């Protein structure tokens, strides 16, 4: 005789879920061991790959930079490596000094000149073009907030005739962060009266062991996770030690208000301020990414002009130069930053905008 529905045995759903999870874990475990057997050396060592990557970055940065209470970090005075010289005052070398009021250049790694030698940076090439001393105050990894603060810190010291503030769109996003690549930084909050500085004095860099998330502490030991993320080109996010304090998009408002501080610096110092937009090389590879980067860039340049600052966008010049030479804009980069030719083009644009002699 058939039993009523209420009396029929129900499937053991929790048990089935546990069996599926157990099978999944066993499968992942087999894949992990198989991958470690393939690479062999990792069969006997089980490092936390995230911690190792962050430790290497921290140790490398300790040699190249020193802590700064206002900016987070600045180049270490006197540091030298093949093709790279940091002067006694913490600026990258641009060559022999020349008399007269200098030009001050501030920015991120594109201004500093990552991936090229001292004479190939655009500040050094600007000095060669104009015959005017150009001070390279660029610093790798800076956000637009740090770039502006750097300009405010250096202008009273060097009393430049002009200040060139260069940026890429990602520098705008960086203003939304409190920590980038393991290093704490100053940032700004927004209130009804404008910008409010936060995280100042900036705390020293934290021990990388203290900033790992639960997932990084747990799955950071997995070679399988590391391998998969490497194939997906997602290791930067997995390894990266970043701390966000503002919702995505807030940086555009912050950066716009920061151009007001640059306008005040222009008034107080008497130095003409020129904003220069450069571009991440990925812009030339992905149209959707390019559209967003250009939108952010054009918005910030519009803010600069509204505050009475001169501003130039290098996008069209990079495109036109490449077409003229029968190449692509990507040819003006090493890997992630401008090469010698790309920096020469930027230097020429700056010289022309400042109404200085250009080749």
Regions found by a protein language model. Name each.
Residues 1-13:
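N-terminal Lys/Arg-rich, disordered targeting/topogenic segments
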Residues 19-34:
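Hydrophobic membrane-insertion alpha-helices, especially the h-region
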Residues 30, 330-359:
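Histidine-centered active-site loop/cap adjacent to the catalytic His
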Residues 32, 108, 147, 163, ...:
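Generic structural signal for small/hydrophobic residues in well-ordered secondary structure
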Residues 40-128, 318-333:
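Membrane/wall-proximal cationic-aromatic binding patches
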Residues 104, 112-205, 209, 213-214:
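Conserved SGNH/GDSL esterase-like catalytic core that processes O-acyl groups on lipids
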Residues 168-301, 309, 314-324:
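Serine-dependent acyl-ester chemistry module
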